[in-house]
Amino acid sequence: MPVPVRRARGFVPEPVPLDPGSDACILALGGQEKGTFTLTRGDAAFVSPHLGDLGDYRSQMNYRSELASFERMLSLSPDVVVRDMHPDYFTSRIAAVLGAGKVIEVQHHHAHAVSVMAEYGISGPVIGVSFDGTGFGGDGTLWGGEFLLARQHDFRRLAHLRHVPLPGGERAVREPWRMSLMYLLSLIHI
């Protein structure tokens, strides 16, 4: 049976099956780059198409339009909104205005671990490894290269790459050679 590598590259009407859990409709807004959202209903998670880099205004408008379409198509209105901890993300800024009674912040790399747990029906705990770029951490710094002991509702950071400056700011996320150079230079200055 083929396994989709990236379900959200196109319209995906078939839901990801979930273990029975909350009856609440949960809207997970995703991060800033490679934007997607997920709506849950009972034991099903409906993943949006890939909506682009949400730093771009057109992508933001498309994101809002797709979200409204999904809510109409599925007859869902979120009871809970889950957003990334990063305060400057588009998804973080719109979370409060989406009409849900409760907004929950989640650490970016913990969200990756939990999404894989949900997809495979694992309740945890697991060791989650995330090397996908930066994520706003609970200590107010940017995290990257995390090893987490993850459960569905919480996690403990077991290990991580050493903190080094981001050469070129957010460009370092899109141009990984910059971070490689910083780590090599940091070895010289031990």
What are these regions (language model features)?
Residues L76-P87:
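Short glycine-rich phosphate-binding loop at a beta-alpha junction
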